[in-house]
Amino acid sequence: STEFQRYMEIVIVVDHSMVKKYNGDSPKIKAWVYEMINTITEGYRDLYIDIILSGLEIWSEKDLINVEASAGNTLKSFGEWRAKDLIHRISHDNAQLLTATDFDGPTIGLAYVASMCEPKLSVGVIQDHSSVNRLVAITLAHEMAHNLGVRHDEKDCVGVVYLCIMRIPVVEDKRSYFSDCSYIQCREYISKENPPCILNKP
């Protein structure tokens, strides 16, 4: 129903390591990102959230923050940069950094939990960890869901017959769904906190 419907305007920032990885081929980078957005848009329909790509920024010359192997440090820097720079240039609700940097350990993404609309905290960082677009897209969807108050799926979540986006580790499947747990957590967060920035239809 429409009372549940929310609109999440996101900006994807592609860092300089990505530019190098794709040999400076902007059209290729854009196509890669657009394909991911199509995938997550499909997944987020289950949560009554429309995903709108408000901006795609490519750091073609150099990084505007210090992107490092520590996902935590990179996340903090990216959030601070968003609050002091990006938010003043592009109207959006949430920003995600896509990097070719290999984060420490098994980490392929990191985001703050239940932080939608917060200037420094409505962010995530994603490692471009696979040549399979869908797998990177699932990581993106996963980190964005943390921003929306969704935690990792426990074993007793309904929907384990198919792959769930919030499962750890993420495995490949034709279509990734949010589990009932994710749906309930997202609804609870939205009804309790009612983050204002995702109410307006752009």
Swiss-Prot record:
The keyword Zinc applies. GO terms for molecular function: metal ion binding; metalloendopeptidase activity; toxin activity. Its main location: secreted. This is Snake venom metalloproteinase Ac1. Keywords: Disulfide bond, Hemostasis impairing toxin, Hydrolase, Metal-binding, Metalloprotease, Protease, Secreted, Toxin, Zinc. PROSITE patterns: ADAM_MEPRO, ZINC_PROTEASE. Zn(2+) binds at residues 142, 146, 152. Binds 1 zinc ion per subunit. Monomer. Belongs to the venom metalloproteinase (M12B) family. P-I subfamily. One of its GO terms (cellular component) is plasma membrane. Its EC number is 3.4.24.-. It comes from Deinagkistrodon acutus (Hundred-pace snake). Disulfide bonds join 117-197, 157-181. It comes from the Eukaryota. The lineage of its organism: Eukaryota, Metazoa, Chordata, Craniata, Vertebrata. Residues 6-202 form the Peptidase M12B domain. The active site is at residue 143. Ca(2+) binds at residues 9, 93, 197, 200. One of its GO terms (biological process) is proteolysis. It is found in: Secreted. Expressed by the venom gland. It is an enzyme of class 3 (hydrolase).
